[in-house]
């Protein structure tokens, strides 16, 4: 982090631009689940077809996040963001014209996934972390994460309105154009991204292979990486399948949209609180508590009779916990290894998250088509929440940055 980044006048424009970009990126992505039912019906598909494409999207997002993190070190944040924006917009427009499972897998899956990777938390949060003073990193990461949730709250209900007015096809085309609009917010971020690849004076360069091998030798990092799989499992399943699940319970599609929107609204507060708290409290115990609370919320939702109150109550509870994992998780990566390698090493952790996302989305669609309900995926989500809590508990919060330049690392 540069010494010139200490004044609020220097970092606030960066933070505001980053937040607006994340609002669009995360908000648009969160709206794709609304198209599961109408697009499937229009093309004569079962829900498993588009669910597979959206599962591939999450997998592509995760794999591309690692690649994008490496590209940031080499080419800088600006070029990665612009490349991601182009892919995001083209993929969304391509999804609108997809009439086969294969084309949906390519557009809604591979291309949009790569676009999200280039415009989402793994690229933008490290730029925020570099822009603000160290003592404000937790707060700033919480603000950035909350902005993504604000996008979910605002854009998902708006997307449902667009579907009602324009039909699913017109709404999806409009979302593609909005994706291109993210380019407006890239310029202020350039100042804190383009020198990411430069090694500090007197420090030897390290290859991505060496960086990966040495980071994976740190036990606490591996526990964090494995535990984040569960976060992706929860978030992606609910984002994609909750609207259809609500309709199956006998409610209107608008209730499904407001369920996702309520998650986004409550997560604005949850993510902000998490960011503030992660600067004051042990991050690993916060993560354990979050995953236990998710498991309890899921089980309570299954046990309560279906009603508007139970749907919105679950959405509010899960929303408060939704992206509250990101400030402590990204903060731990920065604490372990510093901010220079954060885009790549957070990208590896996020790849685990997206493997969980792929599992949750695909398995949800598969179980629905084979059993006719979502009970199995809900129960597995509760069980995995408890497992994640156990995985995070033994994490040791300390710096392992020296291990990246050591001949060997074993912690």
Regions found by a protein language model. Give the residues of each.
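Hydrophobic core of transmembrane alpha-helices in multi-pass small-molecule transporters
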Residues: 23, 91, 103-119, 229, ...
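Conserved MFS/SLC helix-loop-helix module at the cytosolic interface between two early adjacent transmembrane helices
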Residues: 63-102
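C-terminal transmembrane helical hairpin of 12-TM major facilitator-type secondary transporters
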Residues: 255, 263-267, 280-332
């Amino acid at each position: 982090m540069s010494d010139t980044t200490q004044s609020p006048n220097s970092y606030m424009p960066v933070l505001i631009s980053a937040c607006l970009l994340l609002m669009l990126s995360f908000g648009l992505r969160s709206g794709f689940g609304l198209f599961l039912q109408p697009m499937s019906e229009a093309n004569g598909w079962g829900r498993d077809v588009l669910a597979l494409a959206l599962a591939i999207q999450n997998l592509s997002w995760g794999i591309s996040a690692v690649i994008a993190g490496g590209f940031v070190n080499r080419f800088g944040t600006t070029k990665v963001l612009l490349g991601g924006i182009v892919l995001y917009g083209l993929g969304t427009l391509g999804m609108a014209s997809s009439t086969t499972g294969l084309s949906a897998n390519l557009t809604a899956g591979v291309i949009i996934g790569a676009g999200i990777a280039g415009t989402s938390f793994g690229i933008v949060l490290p730029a925020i972390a570099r822009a603000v003073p160290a003592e404000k990193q937790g707060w700033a990461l919480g603000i950035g994460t909350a902005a993504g949730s604000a996008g979910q709250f605002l854009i998902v209900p708006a997307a449902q309105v667009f579907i009602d007015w324009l039909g699913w096809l017109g709404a999806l085309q409009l979302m593609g154009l909005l994706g291109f609009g993210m380019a407006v917010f890239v310029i202020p971020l350039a100042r804190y991204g383009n020198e990411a690849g430069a090694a500090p004076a007197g420090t030897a360069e390290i290859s991505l292979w060496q960086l990966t091998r040495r980071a994976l030798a740190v036990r606490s990092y591996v526990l964090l990486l494995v535990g984040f799989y569960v976060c992706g499992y929860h978030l992606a399943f609910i984002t994609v399948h909750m609207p259809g699940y609500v309709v199956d319970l006998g409610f209107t599609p608008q209730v499904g949209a407001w369920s996702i929107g309520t998650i986004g609204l409550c997560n604005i507060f949850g993510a902000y609180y998490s960011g503030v708290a992660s600067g004051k409290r042990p991050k690993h115990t916060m993560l354990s508590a979050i995953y236990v609370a998710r498991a309890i919320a899921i089980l309570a939702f299954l046990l309560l009779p279906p009603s508007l109150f139970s749907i919105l109550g679950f959405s509010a509870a899960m929303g408060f916990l939704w992206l509250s994992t990101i400030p402590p998780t990204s903060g731990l990566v920065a604490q372990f290894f510093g901010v220079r390698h954060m885009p790549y090493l957070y990208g590896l952790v996020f790849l685990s998250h997206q493997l969980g996302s792929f599992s949750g989305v695909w398995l949800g669609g598969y179980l629905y088509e084979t059993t006719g309900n979502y009970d199995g995926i809900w129960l597995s989500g509760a069980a995995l929440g408890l497992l994640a809590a156990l995985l995070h508990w033994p994490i040791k919060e300390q710096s392992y940055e020296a291990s990246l330049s050591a001949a060997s690392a074993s912690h």
